[in-house]
Protein backbone atom coordinates (compact mmCIF):
# COMPACT_ATOMS: atom_id res chain seq x y z
CA UNK A 1 0.00 0.00 0.00
CA UNK A 2 2.86 2.36 0.75
CA UNK A 3 4.17 2.00 -2.78
CA UNK A 4 0.76 2.70 -4.29
CA UNK A 5 0.42 5.79 -2.08
CA UNK A 6 3.86 7.03 -3.13
CA UNK A 7 2.98 6.42 -6.79
CA UNK A 8 -0.25 8.39 -6.38
CA UNK A 9 1.55 11.25 -4.63
CA UNK A 10 4.05 11.45 -7.45
CA UNK A 11 1.37 11.49 -10.15
CA UNK A 12 -0.75 14.01 -8.28
CA UNK A 13 2.37 16.17 -8.02
CA UNK A 14 2.64 16.26 -11.81
CA UNK A 15 4.98 13.34 -12.50
CA UNK A 16 2.94 11.23 -14.94
CA UNK A 17 5.49 8.40 -15.11
CA UNK A 18 7.28 8.16 -11.75
CA UNK A 19 10.43 6.05 -11.66
CA UNK A 20 11.74 3.83 -8.87
CA UNK A 21 14.06 6.60 -7.72
CA UNK A 22 11.14 9.07 -7.57
CA UNK A 23 9.12 6.76 -5.35
CA UNK A 24 12.18 5.89 -3.27
CA UNK A 25 12.73 9.61 -2.56
CA UNK A 26 9.12 9.98 -1.43
CA UNK A 27 9.28 6.94 0.84
CA UNK A 28 12.72 7.83 2.23
CA UNK A 29 11.46 11.30 3.14
CA UNK A 30 9.10 9.75 5.70
CA UNK A 31 11.47 7.03 6.89
CA UNK A 32 9.95 4.03 5.10
CA UNK A 33 12.30 1.28 4.00
CA UNK A 34 11.92 0.31 0.35
CA UNK A 35 11.74 -3.27 -0.89
CA UNK A 36 12.96 -3.05 -4.48
CA UNK A 37 10.96 -6.08 -5.68
CA UNK A 38 7.67 -4.71 -4.36
CA UNK A 39 8.41 -1.25 -5.70
CA UNK A 40 9.17 -2.62 -9.17
CA UNK A 41 6.00 -4.72 -9.13
CA UNK A 42 3.79 -1.73 -8.25
CA UNK A 43 5.37 0.45 -10.94
CA UNK A 44 4.91 -2.27 -13.56
CA UNK A 45 1.27 -2.87 -12.55
CA UNK A 46 0.34 0.83 -12.60
CA UNK A 47 2.39 1.83 -15.65
CA UNK A 48 0.19 3.42 -18.30
CA UNK A 49 -3.01 3.23 -16.24
CA UNK A 50 -5.28 6.11 -15.32
CA UNK A 51 -5.35 6.41 -11.52
CA UNK A 52 -9.03 7.39 -11.49
CA UNK A 53 -9.85 4.11 -13.25
CA UNK A 54 -7.64 2.15 -10.85
CA UNK A 55 -9.39 3.73 -7.86
CA UNK A 56 -12.85 3.03 -9.33
CA UNK A 57 -11.88 -0.60 -9.98
CA UNK A 58 -10.62 -0.93 -6.41
CA UNK A 59 -13.86 0.49 -5.03
CA UNK A 60 -15.84 -2.11 -6.99
CA UNK A 61 -13.69 -4.90 -5.58
CA UNK A 62 -14.06 -3.60 -2.03
CA UNK A 63 -17.83 -3.34 -2.42
CA UNK A 64 -18.00 -7.05 -3.22
CA UNK A 65 -16.07 -8.06 -0.08
CA UNK A 66 -18.29 -9.09 2.85
CA UNK A 67 -17.90 -6.59 5.64
CA UNK A 68 -18.73 -8.89 8.53
CA UNK A 69 -21.76 -6.88 9.64
CA UNK A 70 -24.10 -9.69 8.62
CA UNK A 71 -22.26 -12.18 10.79
CA UNK A 72 -22.89 -10.18 13.95
CA UNK A 73 -26.59 -9.93 13.16
CA UNK A 74 -26.88 -13.66 12.53
CA UNK A 75 -25.04 -14.70 15.69
CA UNK A 76 -27.89 -14.08 18.18
CA UNK A 77 -30.35 -16.07 16.06
CA UNK A 78 -28.04 -19.08 16.04
CA UNK A 79 -27.64 -19.02 19.84
CA UNK A 80 -30.88 -20.88 20.57
CA UNK A 81 -32.89 -19.53 23.50
CA UNK A 82 -32.34 -22.32 26.04
CA UNK A 83 -32.30 -20.00 29.07
CA UNK A 84 -35.45 -18.91 30.88
CA UNK A 85 -35.96 -15.09 31.07
CA UNK A 86 -36.45 -15.35 34.84
CA UNK A 87 -32.99 -16.91 35.20
CA UNK A 88 -31.46 -14.02 33.25
CA UNK A 89 -32.97 -11.50 35.67
CA UNK A 90 -31.53 -13.37 38.64
CA UNK A 91 -28.05 -13.38 37.10
CA UNK A 92 -28.12 -9.61 36.64
CA UNK A 93 -28.81 -9.07 40.33
CA UNK A 94 -25.65 -10.94 41.33
CA UNK A 95 -23.25 -8.52 39.61
CA UNK A 96 -20.41 -7.31 41.86
CA UNK A 97 -20.42 -3.72 43.06
CA UNK A 98 -18.03 -1.23 41.52
CA UNK A 99 -14.81 -0.58 43.41
CA UNK A 100 -14.40 2.81 45.00
CA UNK A 101 -11.40 5.12 44.62
CA UNK A 102 -10.53 4.59 48.30
CA UNK A 103 -9.15 1.14 47.53
CA UNK A 104 -6.57 2.52 45.14
CA UNK A 105 -4.74 4.69 47.62
CA UNK A 106 -5.01 7.88 45.60
CA UNK A 107 -7.71 10.27 44.53
CA UNK A 108 -8.35 11.86 41.20
CA UNK A 109 -7.55 15.42 42.35
CA UNK A 110 -4.84 14.76 44.97
UniProtKB/Swiss-Prot annotation:
Disulfide bonds: none
Post-translational modifications: Phosphorylated.
Biological process per Gene Ontology, one example term: cytoplasmic translational elongation
Keyword terms of this UniProt record: Phosphoprotein, Ribonucleoprotein, Ribosomal protein
InterPro entries: P1/P2_N_sf, Ribosomal_P1/P2, Ribosomal_P2
One GO term describing the cellular component: cytosolic large ribosomal subunit
Record has Kinase as a keyword: no
Location of region: Disordered: 63-110
Gene Ontology molecular-function annotations: structural constituent of ribosome
CDD domains in the cross-refs: Ribosomal_P2
Signal peptide: none
Pfam families, per the entry: Ribosomal_60s
Composition-biased stretches (Basic and acidic residues): 86-95
The family this protein is said to belong to: Belongs to the eukaryotic ribosomal protein P1/P2 family.
Known role: Plays an important role in the elongation step of protein synthesis.
Complex and partners: P1 and P2 exist as dimers at the large ribosomal subunit.
Protein name, per record: Large ribosomal subunit protein P2
Annotated source species: Cryptochiton stelleri (Giant gumboot chiton)
